[in-house]
Amino acid sequence: WIGRW
């Protein structure tokens, strides 16, 4: 998720 948001 850290790469998406």
UniProtKB/Swiss-Prot annotation:
Organism encoding this protein: Mus musculus (Mouse)
Miscellaneous information on this protein: On the 2D-gel the determined pI of this unknown protein is: 6.6, its MW is: 19 kDa.
Protein name, UniProt field: Unknown protein from 2D-PAGE of fibroblasts
